[in-house]
Design a protein with these regions (language model features):
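Active-site-adjacent "subsite" loops/lids of carbohydrate-active enzymes
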Residues: 4-19, 29-88
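Aromatic-lined substrate-binding rim segments of carbohydrate-active enzymes
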Residues: 1-33, 121-148
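Aromatic- and acidic-residue-enriched segments that line the glycan-binding/catalytic groove
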Residues: 1, 36-62, 98-122, 167
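Active-site neighborhood of glycoside hydrolase catalytic domains
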Residues: 73-177
Length: 177
């Protein structure tokens, strides 16, 4: 297929999956990757893609384009997309992956210092500010889903342990990022 174009003949894979799951007594949880706007392997983006419409709202990080989590308009945009999914489809749950900032990549810094300076809300540490943005997003996502269909489950795929002994005395005995 081509991004931004409906398949011909038209069919809706999410609707089809919901029907097939429900016929079999199974739940269907839609799974999205909210901040990742373009992966390394993506070559062409539709003209109406958020990256083309609002290039200042994304940053390049290690070859990927990421919707900047520090911008309130990006949190709202993602919540609007989720609201559309929840309203239009009979999903049983919505699951998000990579709901946080990009994983560390050697030699790359997350280019959000300008947004931190502008929107820090008095938070003195950029990493605390990033966690604050994630918390704002989680709350907005939960409220968005529950306002439309309170019974729809909301799930998150967190990444391991947030701290380990190699970077914090109070961390876990793990060796993850």
């Amino acid at each position: 297929g081509v991004q931004g174009k409906a398949p011909n003949p038209y069919w809706d894979p999410l609707q089809w999956m919901i029907e097939q799951c429900h016929k079999r007594g199974m739940e269907l949880h839609a799974w999205i990757n909210p901040y990742r706007a373009k992966t390394k392997g993506t070559s062409a983006l539709a003209k109406n893609h958020v990256v083309n419409l609002h290039p200042s709202r994304v940053f390049d990080y290690d070859g990927q384009l990421i919707l900047n989590p520090g911008l309130a308009e990006n949190r709202k945009y993602i919540c609007d997309v989720v609201a559309d999914i929840v309203a239009r489809y009979d999903i049983d749950g919505l699951h998000i992956d990579d709901y946080f900032y990009p994983y560390p990549s050697p030699g790359h810094e997350i280019p959000d210092a300008q947004q931190y300076k502008q929107y820090s809300n008095g938070i003195n540490d950029i990493n605390d500010w990033r966690r604050y943005n994630v918390n704002l997003y989680m709350q907005a996502m939960q409220e968005t889903i529950k306002a439309i269909k309170p019974w729809v489950k909301f799930g998150v795929s967190p990444f391991g342990s947030c701290r380990n002994k190699k970077n914090s005395q109070i961390g876990s005995e793990t060796n993850g990022l």
